UniProtKB/Swiss-Prot annotation:
<dbReference type="InterPro" id="IPR002119">
    <property type="entry name" value="Histone_H2A"/>
</dbReference>
<feature type="cross-link" description="Glycyl lysine isopeptide (Lys-Gly) (interchain with G-Cter in ubiquitin)">
    <location>
        <position position="117"/>
    </location>
</feature>
<feature type="cross-link" description="Glycyl lysine isopeptide (Lys-Gly) (interchain with G-Cter in SUMO2)">
    <location>
        <position position="320"/>
    </location>
</feature>
<dbReference type="InterPro" id="IPR009072">
    <property type="entry name" value="Histone-fold"/>
</dbReference>
<comment type="similarity">
    <text>Belongs to the histone H2A family.</text>
</comment>
<dbReference type="GO" id="GO:1901837">
    <property type="term" value="P:negative regulation of transcription of nucleolar large rRNA by RNA polymerase I"/>
</dbReference>
<dbReference type="InterPro" id="IPR035796">
    <property type="entry name" value="Macro_H2A"/>
</dbReference>
<dbReference type="InterPro" id="IPR007125">
    <property type="entry name" value="Histone_H2A/H2B/H3"/>
</dbReference>
<comment type="subunit">
    <text>The nucleosome is a histone octamer containing two molecules each of H2A, H2B, H3 and H4 assembled in one H3-H4 heterotetramer and two H2A-H2B heterodimers.</text>
</comment>
<keyword id="KW-0539">Nucleus</keyword>
<dbReference type="InterPro" id="IPR032454">
    <property type="entry name" value="Histone_H2A_C"/>
</dbReference>
<feature type="modified residue" description="N6-lactoyllysine; alternate">
    <location>
        <position position="9"/>
    </location>
</feature>
<dbReference type="GO" id="GO:0000786">
    <property type="term" value="C:nucleosome"/>
</dbReference>
<feature type="domain" description="Histone H2A">
    <location>
        <begin position="15"/>
        <end position="90"/>
    </location>
</feature>
<dbReference type="InterPro" id="IPR002589">
    <property type="entry name" value="Macro_dom"/>
</dbReference>
<feature type="cross-link" description="Glycyl lysine isopeptide (Lys-Gly) (interchain with G-Cter in ubiquitin); alternate">
    <location>
        <position position="116"/>
    </location>
</feature>
<dbReference type="InterPro" id="IPR021171">
    <property type="entry name" value="Core_histone_macro-H2A"/>
</dbReference>
Length: 369
């Protein structure tokens, strides 16, 4: 009752408040009716539309905020919104035809062009490129001989020799590294500058990438899960290469990484790294440093693809979730700080379902990092 005895004026509850959304449901209903006067509009249609738009807006704002944070800006700009949409596959497909005012354009930078400006890296191309021309001739000649023999055996031999040709091809070729036939990519995530992170369930010794990473210790021990697999596939040549590397390099420092040729493997190079043990001093920081050192070595060799196992989660005792988070964080921050990287694809080669689930989950959380 009011002071004069009349009924107290009640405030009208809006459709948005009743539905529990912020976006105006009544306005959505008017817009829908205006465009479709001949159709009956259900009560739930504008509510659902408002809820979807509210969710998409919140998602884009979160990604744009991450982009602003990574670029060390205190305010979200249209540029950050553009980067946020471009970095998320689903949003990019939905809004690829939308122009964001004052958002600028997405850079399409070829890392090779930027790297040529650096005098130190120009010499590496001359070192890597000469061998392929010599090796590429002999397999092609042997391939024609194998065809003459006929039958299925000849076809199998020719396939093996084609694999050798692709292995001896230059690391500066335009083709990106792909996993061996028969293995499917379980999850893919694209980063800002176009690098792809892919989860693959396979044997790392059979992955056809430019480099594979071998977690070891200071003495280049090859008895771990990855080391024994590579040793079995690479054979005597691989073992001799590791022994020679040990003599030449000496003990491998914690978080250190060195490279050797991938004898007997589909990969052209093997990057040996000494990751820290769980619980040791600054172990998380050193694991990130290990991953970044592996990527830096791949960049020095102008490699386009690199395959990582789950570093640290084996003998070194890191929890799988923690190891995955640190590895992905290190890779993301490396590509943010290194504008001229030649690496196009990073494979996470896993074999157990637990690790696969963890990496797929953690990659989805990367967002705009």
């Amino acid at each position: 009752m009011s002071s004069r005895g009349g009924k107290k004026k009640s405030t009208k509850t809006s459709r948005s408040a009743k539905a529990g959304v912020i976006f105006p449901v009544g306005r959505m209903l008017r817009y829908i009716k205006k465009g479709h006067p001949k159709y009956r509009i259900g009560v739930g249609a504008p509510v659902y539309m408002a809820a979807v738009l509210e969710y998409l807006t919140a998602e884009i704002l979160e990604l744009a905020g991450n982009a602003a944070r990574d670029n060390k800006k205190g305010r979200v700009t249209p540029r950050h919104i553009l980067l946020a949409v471009a970095n998320d596959e689903e949003l990019n497909q939905l809004l690829k035809g939308v122009t964001i005012a004052s958002g600028g354009v997405l850079p399409n930078i070829h890392p090779e062009l930027l790297a040529k400006k650096r005098g130190s890296k120009g010499k590496l191309e001359a070192i890597i490129t000469p061998p392929p021309a010599k090796k590429a001739k002999s397999p092609s000649q042997k391939k024609t001989v194998s065809k003459k023999t006929g039958g299925k055996k000849g076809a199998r031999k020719s396939k093996k020799k084609q694999g050798e040709v692709s292995k001896s091809a230059s690391a500066d070729s335009t083709t990106e590294g792909t996993p061996a036939d028969g293995f499917t990519v379980l999850s893919t995530k694209s980063l800002f500058l176009g690098q792809k992170l892919q989860v693959v369930q396979a044997d790392i010794a059979t992955i056809d990438s430019d480099a594979v990473v071998h977690p070891t210790n200071s003495d280049f021990y090859t008895g771990g899960e990855v080391g024994s697999t590579l040793e079995k596939k690479g054979g005597k040549e691989f073992v001799e290469a590791v022994i020679e590397l040990r003599k030449k390099n000496g003990p491998l420092d914690i978080a250190g990484a060195v490279v050797s040729a991938g004898h007997g493997l589909p990969a052209k190079f093997v990057i040996h790294c000494n990751s820290p043990g769980w619980g040791s001093d600054k172990c998380e920081e050193l694991l990130e440093k290990t991953v970044k050192n592996c990527l830096a070595l791949a960049d020095e060799k102008k490699l386009k693809s690199i395959a990582f196992p789950s570093i640290g989660s084996g003998r070194n005792g890191f929890p799988k979730q923690t190891a995955a988070q640190l590895i992905l964080k290190a890779i993301s921050s490396y590509f943010v700080s290194t504008m001229s990287s030649s690496i196009k694809t990073v494979y996470f080669v896993l074999f157990d379902s637990e690790s696969i689930g963890i990496y797929v989950q953690e990659m989805a959380k990367l967002d705009a990092n």
